Amino acid sequence: MRSNNNNPLTRDEILSRYFPQYRPAVAASQGLSGGSCIIAHDTHRVVLRRHHDPDAPPAHFLRHYRALSQLPASLAPRALFYTPGWMAVEYLHGVVNSALPDADELAALLYHLHQQPRFGWRIALSPLLAQYWSCCDPARRTPFWLRRLKQLQKNGEPRPLRLAPLHMDVHGDNIVLTSAGLRLIDWEYAGDGDIALELAAVWVEDERQHRQLANAYAACARIDARQLWRQIRLWHPWVIMLKAGWFEYRWRQTGEQQFIRLADETWRQLRMKG
């Protein structure tokens, strides 16, 4: 269901107009951010998500809805409703762990995603990194950051190994173990890109876990494991800069100390690796 109203509504207006029998439920943090909430009617729950990034165009939020609309139930929650500034999606009952699932299980889930039809829009990291630079706190801009950004832009993004629909925010809190298996939530960064970029961006604990995931995925996809790992490593500098820039971006938006701590730690990692 999609509304044609062009003026963003408040949460209370959304509830009274489109979900009159629903009320806000107990807040939950998994996969929710920026004013999103769970609403409930008796035992039925729905996730109401708000477009919370003031620097992102409305088209990006609509892409999020469209991605969910075309994905199968074996991968993601169903998209239920859209109006400018808001969407409602299925609430997935299950268990959310901060740790990633077993490498074989996660590889199978990602391979299943990458076998789906493409979304129709490409993920382009270079303009995204430039946006993070321009939108961050000016006091946080450093010569080191600018040098790394210019070097990546000069080199250009790696040539894709295989193009596929990507989730691009795979970590434990965005994976729900339902009665029917693993599902991914929080698809706001989804788009088409290199499968190795997806694997490079997974929030792993260390290189050992990363290699286990890469090897398991190579077995699923019948790709040479060494070739896949080389491609993942080509994307690694881009992903680290992406994470650092995103932390800076969120720090400027929210002022939350967790983001500045994460940004500082990511910059330390980059400097240690030269």
Curated annotation (Swiss-Prot):
GO terms for biological process, alphabetical: thiamine diphosphate biosynthetic process; thiamine metabolic process
EC number, UniProt record: 2.7.1.89
Superkingdom in the source lineage: Bacteria
Signal peptide: none
InterPro entries in the cross-refs: Aminoglycoside_PTrfase, Kinase-like_dom_sf, Thiamine_kinase
Protein name as catalogued: Thiamine kinase
Molecular function, one GO term: ATP binding
Tagged with keyword Kinase: yes
Keyword ATP-binding attached: yes
HAMAP family in UniProt: Thiamine_kinase
Organism: Salmonella paratyphi C (strain RKS4594)
Family: Belongs to the thiamine kinase family.
Annotated metabolic or biological route of this protein: Cofactor biosynthesis; thiamine diphosphate biosynthesis; thiamine phosphate from thiamine: step 1/1
Catalytic activity from the UniProt record: thiamine + ATP = thiamine phosphate + ADP + H(+)
Keywords of this entry: ATP-binding, Kinase, Nucleotide-binding, Transferase
A Pfam family: APH
Function, in words: Catalyzes the ATP-dependent phosphorylation of thiamine to thiamine phosphate. Is involved in thiamine salvage.
